[in-house]
Regions:
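Low-complexity, acidic Ser/Thr/Pro/Gly-rich terminal tails and inter-domain linkers that flank the onset
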Residues: 36-42
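Charged, amphipathic alpha-helical segments and their flanking helix caps
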Residues: 1-28, 42-118
Length: 118
């Protein structure tokens, strides 16, 4: 287990190690950012598994974006991201969508990890 800031840094570092990604952002990517890219999204914190209440469960949403027309590129990137993450990060779910405004493909992936309270 580790603290919240370290968890987000580990995720960002793992994303940066995925060679296919052209950028990793904490907020929205710039409008001229080449595809594919990643954005760190929402973070939700819930009670952990321990009776002592010294643990927290974090859910972190990652957003992968691609202008490639089709789902294959994002599915491959999701696999690469999972492989790059430390072993204690658990894949929870993902949803693959098409952003109608931009025409880009969008994969929202939720990760689960445990950290120490406070």
């Amino acid at each position: 287990m580790t603290d919240r800031a370290s968890i987000l840094q580990q995720i960002a570092d793992a994303l940066r190690s995925v060679e296919e990604l052209t950028g990793v952002f904490d907020e929205q990517a710039p409008a001229d950012q080449p595809s594919p890219s990643a954005v760190l999204g929402a973070v939700q914190e819930l009670p952990g598994r321990l009776i002592s209440d010294t643990e927290r469960k974090l859910f972190v949403t990652l957003h992968l974006w691609s202008e490639y027309q089709g789902k294959v590129e994002l599915l491959r990137l999701a696999d690469a991201v999972e492989q790059a993450l430390p072993f204690n990060f658990c894949f929870d779910d993902f949803q693959l969508l098409k952003d109608e405004a931009s025409g880009w493909e969008h994969l929202a992936m939720t990760l689960r990890v445990y950290c120490t309270k406070g």
